[in-house]
Amino acid sequence: MKLILNADDFGLTESVNHGIVDCLQAGMVKSTTIMMNQPGTQHAVELYHQGKVPEVGLHFTVTAGKPLTPPELVPSLVDAQGNFLDNVTLFDKADVVEEQVTLELNAQYRAAINAGLTINHSVSPHFGGGFKPLKAAFTRA
């Protein structure tokens, strides 16, 4: 068996990005997962292209920040300001539309590919595998 320690939330902020790079360089973790819709995403992409991140996965998120898809196309996932609902609110909703989740996850994947990232794994948000609309969309994305 092989244990891989992964640093989550690459792209969240520049400070988080620097911490993850430090952990990678120290051998404390082997890979990271990038969030494509966060304030530090562009900085994370630059660090990747500088060779400071050997392996990167995609951290799909539908509970933090703003969607990459126009909010009017994913209304079951966002609040009145166009921000993603937090995980507690989202997981309590009965009317989350699976197709909207799929649309957003695909947008995040395309953004990663368009940024020149070679994605070698992915993770779902907040154990989304236990929430039917996220599980179904994540399985297809």
Functional labels for PLM-detected ranges:
Residues 1-14:
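Boundary/entry segment of secreted carbohydrate-active catalytic domains
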Residues 2-4, 29-33, 53-59, 118-123:
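Structural preference for beta-strand elements that scaffold enzyme active sites
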Residues 8-10, 35-37, 59-63, 125-127:
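Active-site beta-loop-alpha junctions enriched in small/polar residues
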Residues 14-39:
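A short alpha/beta connector and helix-capping loop motif
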Residues 20-26, 42-55, 72-79, 113-114:
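Acidic (Asp/Glu)-rich catalytic clusters
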Residues 67-97:
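Active-site gating loops and adjacent loop-to-helix segments of metal-dependent hydrolytic enzymes
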Residues 95-109:
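Alpha-helical scaffold elements lining the catalytic groove of polysaccharide deacetylases
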Residues 106-141:
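Catalytic domains of cell-wall/extracellular-matrix polysaccharide-remodeling enzymes
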